[in-house]
Amino acid sequence: EVILPSRTASNLAVIINELILNSIEHGFEGRQQGLIGLHTEESADGYVLELYDNGCGLPPDFDLEKTRSLGLQIIRTLVRDDMGGEIELYNQQGTRARISIPKNPEGGEY
């Protein structure tokens, strides 16, 4: 069981929703079906979420720091600025988004 502060849980809901929408809209063009999955890990000091798909992957020149995608800019801001975490997007048999966030030592607001 994982109990998260309400703000962290809300941020993660937005992030996961946005990543799934990106997979559906951009990853499976011209295909009838595809796979989207989510893997989570907990460590003593944080959480790792990895959302993945088996779609066409990111463009060769993709750069998260230079993206014009509003959704990805929002994700980047939520992860880094609001939750003090890190995000990586990379190709591996489709697209993978790896998000690492620290645990809140105070427990946050519920």
Name the predicted role of every residue range:
Residues G94-P105:
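Short C-terminal beta-strand
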Residues E1-I20, I24-I36:
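Conserved short strand/loop->alpha-helix "switch" segment adjacent to the catalytic nucleotide/phosphoryl-transfer site
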Residues G46-Q73:
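Glycine-rich/acidic phosphate-handling loop/turn and adjacent ATP-lid/helix
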Residues H39-E41, Y52, E88-Y90, S100:
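Solvent-exposed beta-strand sheet faces enriched in polar/charged residues
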Residues M83-Y90, R96:
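Glycine-rich ATP-binding loops of the HATPase_c
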Residues Q33-D45:
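Short beta-strand/loop element within the Bergerat-fold HATPase_c
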Residues A44-V48, G94-R96:
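A generic structural signal for beta-strand entry/edge sites
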Residues I74-G84:
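Conserved glycine-/histidine-rich ATP-lid loop and adjacent helix of the Bergerat-fold HATPase_c
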